[in-house]
Each structure stands twice: as structure tokens, then as C-alpha cells.
Curated annotation (Swiss-Prot):
Residues 155-169 have a biased composition (Acidic residues). Residues 1-42, 60-107, 146-177, 214-369 are annotated as: Disordered. This is Putative uncharacterized protein DDB_G0275317. It comes from Dictyostelium discoideum (Social amoeba). Residues 30-42, 70-86, 219-324 have a biased composition (Low complexity). Residues 12-24, 87-101 have a biased composition (Polar residues).
Length: 369
């Protein structure tokens, strides 16, 4: 350490302008008086003086009182308490002349080392700790997710199923309105039949009146259908009237049967229950027959018109051919393949062989010749 300090002093030299970097070593074994009296030293130093640009040492509280071992009056605590502060400089502890040589050597070596380090003027900068922005202050909070959910929580599937049900014909209001009304009318007809069965014991006349109302309604339907047929000039009014008369006769026969049954019930009081039940069944059968006749009246009238026209009027073949019949049109369309294009199935393929137009024209020309 001493060799390094001497080499440093030789390189820098005492005549350098930067005097703070120059350290003059005191002679070994010399005391403070010799240092002050040495005229060879360019810088007069006093032991314990604070060097410029250095920090002050922290002096513990024990060293500031009479327990300081470096104090000159360490053994005389009672007499020299006031002089204890004079031995302690600002921040440093100065050994006194009463110290032994070993303590002086240790103090001189430590002071030389510290002076050398201070002479280097090394600035130590302590940067403020920077917070790492990449590291989060707290751990992420886990969010529990249910692995299994109830059937009611799956809104998407329930919506899809409802939409699929809505697209079906059974739930479509536009397409199934007529079928819904039809089911209601059938249910009402069954209810009316059950009411007839249950109430014929005391209200047999009501069943007959309801039958008459149904027959009148049936006659009104016949009149409306006949009016529609009269709009067609090719229909035969006489045949329509005959059909109406026949239907009315059937209704009258039904009414007569009901009246006969009622008379029999009056004559035989013991068989009232059975006859009333028979009347109810007859009324239900009549209502079903009326509904069947009502459903097929248009077809029967049209077929009767055609048959009567063929039998009675042999000269009206042209008029009969003008009567529109859907089934006849479809048959003619299928058979007449020479003038109509072939029908196509669901895949777009023709069922019949395609005939080019020039062949059709040639065939037609050959027929004319």
C-alpha cells in the first residue's frame, strides 16, 4: 500500500495543479508534532481534519461521551466531562498522545488508505430503482368457468329448436290455419254428437231440430254450389235441379225416419231409452252422410252433368268438350307428346325422348299430304 502511494506521488508530483490528488506520506514513527513541523511537505495537514469532497463518518453515541476510549480523560470521568467534546472533531475520531504506538500505527495506516481512496475522486452515483413495467404488481385473478351447464342455459340450442319447430307446417299460421279450423270443426261435431247421446232422454226434440238445421244448411250449400255451376254456360240447369230434388228427398226421408222413431217411442214407453239411443246414432250417421255428400257434391254434379248431356243431347259434343276437367287435361297432356315438350322430373331430366322441331314439322307435313 505504501509503495503504491509513493509511486503515485512520484508520477503526479507535488508541483501539479491538482493538489487534491497528491498525498504526502508522513515518516514512520513520527507524531503529529513532527508532521506540523515538517517543512518539506507542501500541504500542511492536521490529524483528524476533514478532507474536501469526502463524507463524514458516523460517530456512535458511545464515542461522544466519556466512554470513548480515545478520549484523553477516559480515566478521569468526574473531573474532565466538559473537555470530552474538544477531542472529537466533526465526524472523525482523533487519537490523543496518550495512546500507545500500536494504536497510532493502526490509525495511520487506516487514514493513509482512506486518504488514497479519497484522492482518486471517484464519484459513486446510486441510481433510483426503476420499476419493471413488464412485471404486474399482482397476480391475475382466476375466473371460474362452469364446465357443465344446464339444458335451460343453452340459449342457442333452444332458439334453434324453436325456429325449426316454427318452420314446420304444423306450427305455421299461414299454412296450417285451415287445418286447425278443420280439427276444431271435427271436434265440435263429436261434441255435438255426445251431447245428443247424453240429452236424448229428456230433449229428444232438440236433436230433431238440430237435424233440421243441418239439413237446411246442407240445402244452402247445394244452392250455392248450383249457383256456381249456373255461372258456367256449359252446365245443365235441369240436372242441377234434379240433384237438388234428390238431395231434398233424402233429407225428407231422414226426417220421416226420425219422426217414425219418435212415434214408436211414444207408443212403447218401455223402449224409450233404446229408441232414443237409436235416434242419436241415426242423427250422427245422417250428419256424417251430409258431410260426405257436401264434400263430393261438386264432383257428383259435374259427372252427372256430363252423363246427362251425353245421353240426352247427342249434338252437344262440342259443348261437353269445353267443360274443364283437370284429370282429362292431364291425360291429354301426357298422351299428346308430339306438340308438347316432355315433362321433367325432380332432377331436370326429361321422361320422354326429345324430338327436334324440324322433325315435328316434317311429320306434320307428311300427315297433311
Amino acid at each position: 500500500m505504501r509503495a503504491a502511494l509513493e509511486e503515485y506521488n512520484q508520477k503526479v508530483g507535488p508541483n501539479n495543479n491538482n493538489q487534491s490528488n497528491t498525498i504526502n506520506l508522513p515518516p514512520v514513527g513520527s507524531n503529529s508534532n513532527n508532521i506540523n513541523d515538517n517543512n518539506n511537505n507542501s500541504i500542511q495537514r492536521k490529524r483528524g481534519a476533514t478532507v474536501i469532497g469526502t463524507r463524514e463518518f458516523h460517530v456512535p453515541s458511545d464515542l461522544k461521551n466519556h466512554h470513548n476510549p480515545y478520549h484523553s480523560n477516559y480515566n478521569n470521568n468526574n473531573n474532565n466531562n466538559n473537555n470530552s467534546s474538544s477531542a472529537i472533531t466533526s465526524g472523525t475520531v482523533a487519537p490523543s498522545s496518550s495512546m500507545n504506538n500500536h494504536q497510532k500505527e493502526d490509525d495511520s495506516y487506516t487514514s493513509l488508505k482512506m486518504r488514497y481512496l479519497r484522492s482518486l475522486n471517484i464519484s459513486i452515483k446510486q441510481e433510483a430503482p426503476t420499476k419493471d413495467t413488464n412485471v404486474s404488481a399482482s397476480a391475475p385473478i382466476p375466473i371460474p368457468i362452469a364446465l357443465s351447464m344446464g339444458r335451460g342455459d343453452l340459449d342457442s340450442e333452444s332458439d334453434i329448436s324453436e325456429k325449426e319447430d316454427d318452420n314446420d307446417g304444423s306450427f305455421d299460421g299461414n299454412s296450417s290455419g285451415n287445418s286447425f279450423l278443420k280439427h276444431n270443426t271435427i271436434a265440435n261435431s263429436y261434441l255435438s254428437g255426445n251431447q245428443f247421446k247424453n240429452n236424448l232422454n229428456s230433449y229428444a226434440g232438440n236433436g230433431i231440430n238440430s237435424m233440421n238445421s243441418l239439413s237446411s244448411h246442407f240445402n244452402n250449400n247445394n244452392n250455392s254450389s248450383n249457383n256456381n255451376n249456373n255461372n258456367n254456360p256449359n252446365n245443365n240447369n235441369n240436372n242441377n235441379n234434379n240433384n237438388n230434388n234428390n238431395n231434398n228427398n233424402n233429407n225428407n226421408n231422414n226426417n220421416n225416419n226420425n219422426n217414425n222413431n219418435n212415434n214408436n217411442n211414444n207408443n212403447n214407453p218401455n223402449n224409450n231409452k233404446n229408441n232414443n239411443n237409436n235416434n242419436g246414432s241415426n242423427i250422427i250417421n245422417n250428419s256424417s252422410n251430409i258431410s260426405k255428400n257436401n264434400g263430393f257434391i261438386m264432383k257428383s254434379n259435374s259427372s252427372n252433368n256430363i252423363d246427362n248431356n251425353n245421353n240426352n243431347n247427342n249434338n252437344n259434343n262440342n259443348n261437353n268438350s269445353n267443360i274443364y276437367n283437370k284429370e282429362d287435361d292431364e291425360e291429354q297432356f301426357d298422351l299428346d307428346t308430339s306438340t308438347t315438350p316432355p315433362r321433367k322430373d325432380s332432377k331436370g331430366k326429361g321422361k320422354h325422348k326429345f324430338i327436334p322441331p324440324h322433325e315435328l314439322l316434317g311429320a306434320a307435313g307428311g300427315d297433311d299430304d
